[in-house]
Amino acid sequence: AVVDVAKERNIPIRVGVNSGSLEKDLVEKYHGVTAEGIVESALDKVHMIEDLGYDNLVISIKSSDVMMCVHAHELLAGKTPYPLHVGITESGTVLSGNIKSAIGLGLILNQGIGDTIRVSLTGDVVEEIKSAKLILRTLGLRKGGIEVVSCPTCGRTKIDQISLANQVEALAAQFPNL
């Protein structure tokens, strides 16, 4: 029924697999939650939808384990013509989630894998968007914004460098298209 409606309206279907909800038979087959199991699950779902005559798909495979997520994307890349939505799921609070997302997405995107991204944080969704844009800019995949370069504080500092750097960064954020 869902495939029929998507077909009528030409709406893409997102095929999503999360390591936390991997099918029991695949967990048993691979002796635990693995990148191989995640990829097999995604491809099984893709083939099921293709067998129903539909191929307007987007694939999303995610894990909160950064290296498992990276490995799963490496395994899946090139095995399907469909766009890949990449992200590290359940990555954590703003600090830990940004670090996990930057490392994971950086490793994935730097290999040319991925068409859309999501940074998942336990926090304000606006922070997720800011983080995603910064990850893309840092990798040279997005233009715009002002990069604020500031060095660590030291004994030679005669001004409140931390406060100044924060003020400059806040000001720079007002000009995202420069």
Q: Model-derived features: where do they sit?
A:
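Active-site-proximal beta-alpha core segment in soluble small-molecule metabolic enzymes
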Residues: 1-30, 34
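Catalytic alpha/beta core domains of metabolic enzymes, predominantly
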Residues: 18, 26-178
